[in-house]
Amino acid sequence: KVYGRCELAAAMKRLGLDNFRGYSLGNWVCAAKFESNFNTHATNRNTDGSTDYGILQINSRWWCNDGRTPGSRNLCNIPCSALLSSDTIASVNCAKKIVSDGNGMNAWVAWRKRCKGTDVNAWTRGCRL
């Protein structure tokens, strides 16, 4: 599923991401835009053999099990395929673990490069939330 900006903001808010660990909803919507272009089915292979999955491009080396990443830690205790679900519940629940892990949203390269230090509130502006 490819979400609309406000549609995703509403879904993320409903799932408790607004101000989770101090990150406003705009941060999450911005991260999703630049990680997956709001597409829940996005997958991208990395040079180390791991793969990033779903709307927040969660990595199989650390966070989920895809059955083909050597030494996968699966810290979210889920199959990576769950991260491709159109309802985003698994992605959001795993993202909460990731952002609580010590590096905050810096765990997402796209957030660090494209969202951090910008006016992320623009990502939720005009949305009925």
UniProtKB/Swiss-Prot annotation:
Chain ranges of the C-type lysozyme domain: 1-129
Note, other: Lysozyme C is capable of both hydrolysis and transglycosylation; it also shows a slight esterase activity. It acts rapidly on both peptide-substituted and unsubstituted peptidoglycan, and slowly on chitin oligosaccharides.
Catalyzed chemical reaction(s): Hydrolysis of (1->4)-beta-linkages between N-acetylmuramic acid and N-acetyl-D-glucosamine residues in a peptidoglycan and between N-acetyl-D-glucosamine residues in chitodextrins
Predominant location: secreted
Provenance organism: Syrmaticus soemmerringii (Copper pheasant)
Enzyme Commission code(s) on record: 3.2.1.17
Function: Lysozymes have primarily a bacteriolytic function; those in tissues and body fluids are associated with the monocyte-macrophage system and enhance the activity of immunoagents.
Upper taxonomic lineage: Eukaryota, Metazoa, Chordata, Craniata, Vertebrata
Protein name, entry field: Lysozyme C
Localization per Swiss-Prot or TrEMBL: Secreted
Quaternary assembly: Monomer.
Gene Ontology biological process terms, A to Z: defense response to Gram-negative bacterium; defense response to Gram-positive bacterium; killing of cells of another organism
